């Protein structure tokens, strides 16, 4: 749905009420096809460089805004592609500061995606 560039610029590719194809074959807490029930937020970067302060600030603002507009969302369910599709995805990767986001949102992240069934369709 969204991309947060390294300078904090926000780019929306897909409206939130539509399905975005960010997760692919994936499973979260026993439920496959994460694209059907999630909002995707990508951060520009690589597995080899830390994310910027601007990205974290924008991410925090986006999450707070989404939770206000969609009361059924919970920060307790925030997780990475690497957790819902670990054999295919590596993002946000080892340089993502989960403790920083956890402290900002007042929850323990990343959410536990549960056991992964590599045969699950998505």
Residue ranges and their predicted role:
Residues 1-72, 76:
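Active-site-adjacent loop/helix surface patches within enzyme catalytic domains
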Residues 32, 47-122:
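Basic/polar, cationic surfaces and motifs that engage anionic cell-wall
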């Amino acid at each position: 749905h969204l991309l947060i560039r390294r300078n904090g610029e926000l780019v929306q590719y897909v409206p939130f009420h539509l399905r975005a194809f960010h997760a692919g074959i994936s499973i979260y807490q026993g439920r496959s096809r994460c694209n059907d029930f999630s909002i995707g937020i990508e951060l520009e970067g690589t597995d080899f460089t830390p994310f910027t302060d601007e990205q974290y600030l924008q991410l925090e603002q986006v999450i707070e805004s989404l939770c206000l507009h969609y009361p059924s969302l919970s920060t307790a369910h925030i997780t990475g592609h690497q957790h819902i599709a670990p054999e295919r995805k590596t993002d946000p990767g080892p340089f993502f500061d989960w403790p920083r986001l956890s402290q900002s949102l007042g929850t323990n992240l990343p959410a536990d995606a549960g056991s992964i069934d590599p045969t699950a369709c998505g």
